[in-house]
């Protein structure tokens, strides 16, 4: 049974108040979010959050999750508002208590955000900025645990909640694949927008762009021109999509990578460690010499040329990478869509940002991208908390 109708009405009115508060106090909220995010990405995050809150009633009607007592959330270090909506606000429709441990990387901003949201509506959530050990003690017998972050860390934390439904939200390679039939101008604009979301500091940003060798020169020329038009400056100024990075150590990581790839840089390449800044940079490789593809968390565009689409499929499905499959954006290669759908959530002629919907399952089929664990059984699939709660607790 879900909450009785009267109780559900109270919960929905609470979310209505939250939506109203976000809209009314948007300037204050933007001031908080732009401590970490660029102004434009913060605005996009607010709009996505409102859209998800507006879809909450339909979501819980669709999946019909039963009432549970407690969710423990190991919160993300980025997209703080949107994550809060997904992991706390929406679950408040079917969960009595939500305990949140903020990421230490974004602690002060998360405290401000939590205080702001609690002023708008009395969501049954508590923010607990304490150690993992103390949080585990306080979380007690949680019905559900939500963990974002490092895959290896998730496995360690999961072992401490053997009875809980454990949901892991991670990251992936998120390739763009651009074929001979692609609309290059459109593909380039979406490629840039996806890579520079919050200056590249997002786990959905693409980390590699596979481009058919016959389209290489045209794509690179278009891509570089689109990059040249980007506004650069302080993150809290509207229109500035590239800014100094927020998270410590990212510019050092980028510098190390770009030093290794210096002979392949065709645009950009400057790094300023003193302000944690990485210039938008284009690196070009062939598939044979691709090297390691890492999660940059900064505006590096790694363009990799290929001759045959099956080469790309084989590379993505290699044993050392198949567990990192989350999303793939396919442009002008319709025959690839079905080949990748068994392992990725696929966007055709769109980016992952274009298709994400907070009221529907999202993610890939690699354990390092996302998984659900219950009673010792690990399964990777696109996740949505209400759906997973319904599947496990609705059986009782």
Model-derived features: where do they sit?
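N-terminal Rossmann-like NAD(P)+-binding subdomain of aldehyde/semialdehyde dehydrogenases
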Residues: 1-70, 83, 90
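Rossmann-like NAD(P) dinucleotide-binding subdomain of oxidoreductase/dehydrogenase enzymes
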Residues: 23, 58-186, 348
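Short, charged/polar "capping" segments at the starts of alpha-helices
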Residues: 106-112, 217-218, 334-339
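Residue-level signal for inorganic ion chemistry
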Residues: 95, 145, 178, 212, ...
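Conserved C-terminal structural/oligomerization subdomain of aldehyde/semialdehyde dehydrogenase
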Residues: 1-19, 114, 119-120, 277-396
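ALDH superfamily catalytic-core signature
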Residues: 8, 118-122, 153-285
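Short glycine-enriched loop/turn motifs at secondary-structure junctions
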Residues: 139-140, 170-172, 202-205, 238-240, ...
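Short, well-ordered alpha-helix to beta-strand connector turns
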Residues: 141-143, 163, 206, 262, ...
């Amino acid at each position: 049974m879900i909450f009785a109708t009267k109780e559900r009405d109270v919960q929905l009115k609470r979310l209505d108040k939250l939506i109203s508060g976000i809209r009314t106090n948007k300037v204050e909220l933007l001031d908080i979010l732009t401590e970490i995010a660029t102004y434009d990405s913060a605005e996009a995050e607010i709009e996505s959050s409102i859209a998800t809150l507006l879809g909450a009633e339909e979501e819980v009607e669709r999946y019909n999750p039963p009432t549970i007592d407690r969710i423990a959330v190991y919160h993300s270090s980025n997209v703080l508002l949107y994550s809060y909506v997904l992991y706390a606000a929406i679950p408040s429709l079917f969960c009595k208590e939500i305990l949140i441990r903020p990421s230490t990387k974004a602690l002060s901003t998360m405290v401000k955000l939590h205080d702001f949201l609690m002023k708008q509506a009395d969501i049954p959530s508590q923010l607990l900025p304490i150690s993992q050990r103390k949080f585990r003690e306080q979380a007690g017998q949680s019905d559900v645990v939500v963990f974002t972050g490092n895959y290896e860390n998730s496995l360690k934390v999961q072992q401490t909640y053997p009875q809980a439904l454990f949901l892991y939200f991670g990251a992936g390679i998120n390739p763009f694949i651009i074929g001979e039939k692609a609309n290059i101008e459109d593909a380039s604009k979406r490629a840039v927008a996806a890579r520079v979301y919050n200056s590249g500091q997002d786990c959905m940003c693409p980390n590699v762009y596979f481009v058919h060798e016959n389209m290489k020169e045209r794509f690179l020329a278009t891509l570089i021109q689109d990059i040249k038009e980007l506004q650069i400056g302080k993150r809290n100024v509207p229109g500035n999509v590239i800014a100094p990075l927020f998270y410590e150590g990212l510019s050092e990581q980028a510098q190390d990578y770009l030093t290794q790839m210096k002979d392949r840089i065709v645009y950009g390449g400057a790094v300023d460690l003193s302000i944690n800044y990485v210039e938008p940079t284009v690196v070009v490789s062939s598939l044979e010499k691709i090297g390691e593809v890492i999660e940059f968390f900064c505006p590096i565009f790694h363009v990799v040329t290929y001759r045959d689409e099956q080469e790309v499929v084989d590379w993505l499905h290699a044993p050392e990478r198949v567990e990192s499959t989350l999303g793939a954006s396919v442009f002008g290669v319709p025959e690839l869509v079905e080949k990748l759908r068994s392992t990725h959530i696929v966007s055709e002629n769109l980016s992952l940002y274009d298709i994400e919907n907070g009221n529907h399952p999202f993610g890939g089929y690699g354990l390092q991208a996302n998984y659900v664990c219950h009673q010792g059984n690990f399964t990777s699939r696109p996740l949505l908390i209400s759906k997973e709660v319904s599947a496990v607790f609705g059986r009782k």
